[in-house]
Amino acid sequence: MSMLQRPGYPNLSVKLFDSYDAWSNNRFVELAATITTLTMRDSLYGRNEGMLQFYDSKNIHTKMDGNEIIQISVANANDINNVKTRIYGCKHFSVSVDSKGDNIIAIELGTIHSIENLKFGRPFFPDAGESIKEMLGVIYQDRTLLTPAINAINAYVPDIPWTSTFENYLSYVREVALAVGSDKFVFVWQDIMGVNMMDYDMMINQEPYPMIVGEPSLIGQFIQELKYPLAYDFVWLTKSNPHKRDPMKNATIYAHSFLDSSIPMITTGKGENSIVVSRSGAYSEMTYRNGYEEAIRLQTMAQYDGYAKCSTIGNFNLTPGVKIIFNDSKNQFKTEFYVDEVIHELSNNNSVTHLYMFTNATKLETIDPVKVKNEFKSDTTTEESSSSNKQ
């Protein structure tokens, strides 16, 4: 008969490799038994960081140069067959000495590609997913096995020479990408599962993750017998925010371009708030001339004006973008919540997951702006040169 693990017990492995060669040959130091704290933080809008602290009784810090690879594998309590693994690099590390004279190493964790901060200088593809794969392929070309998993969708972005970093490209995709299959704006983020993409329709139509709200001390050892995971310390950071929500109900979006003399508009309500978007330069390659991409994203997300946080026992299945429905005896939670940020806090014998979520305080309205197809000539230089050669 197998023993049940205590709820929140992390099945944790933390392996320290001194190089890619050591990783390839599985030559490592196991740190799980020596850690004091491990924090992993991921958000829907591009924040990925972590902190690892562990006792250094063997003076490992004297041999470290900051180019180490940290491989973290975790699994929920009583779910050891569902192990999730991610690779971190070392942004920087420090060493302190405690009251007993023992060394404690603190490593700020980050993805290897964000630490290297490689700046590109080349065009990629109009498909954002293909560009992401190509960028990571370049960054990890000398250590291909470390490349994070990529879960992409077909999303169009203007095809321009990219002269910045991978992280800035993800921000660019969030701002301008349009899913080819749905004409909806796109979310792209990184977490323990890799680099992920989904459009707005995918987010709202996904299967919800049910949780119940309660107090762990009242449930005690029976917490593992609950049908759904328990959320506690639930706090509304913002229950309703008309200051951010309502201006988008009374706005006009002007799409200005230096390539023609027209200024198409999208108006909601009386249109008293002015928003100017560009259709010049790279933005002249957008799918729609009238600012549809910006309008649907701004007007839709402005409706999600509620923000809340809660905690639960360590649950590594919860990642950014997950849809959650809460149940409680008083029926206080009437809307669906979407995970904006996840923070996992672990020691070598316990774990807690903190969730930050957005939701809507008022009834959601369907946003469907008019579409005006972009008819700019995207390759005028070639056309002019061809016509002059014919003459």
From Swiss-Prot:
Organism of provenance: Enterobacteria phage T4
The name this protein goes by in its record: Baseplate central spike complex protein gp27
Entry GO terms, CC: virus tail; virus tail, baseplate
Signal peptide segment: none
Disulphide bridges: none
Subunit structure: Homotrimer. Heteromultimer with gp5 trimer and gp5.4 monomer; this interaction forms the tail lysozyme complex that creates an extension of the tail tube. The T4 tail lysozyme complex is made up of three copies of the proteolytically processed gp5 and three copies of gp27. Part of the baseplate macromolecular complex which consists of gp5, gp5.4, gp27 (central spike complex); gp6, gp25, gp53 (inner baseplate); gp7, gp8 (intermediate baseplate); gp9, gp10, gp11, gp12 (peripheral); gp48 and gp54 (proximal region of the tail tube).
Induction trigger: Expressed in the late phase of the viral replicative cycle.
Keywords: Late protein, Viral baseplate protein, Viral release from host cell, Viral tail assembly, Viral tail protein, Virion
Record's subcellular location: Virion
Main location class: virion
Role noted for this protein: Baseplate central spike complex-associated protein involved in the tail assembly.
One of the GO BP terms on file: viral tail assembly
Source organism, top-level taxon: Viruses
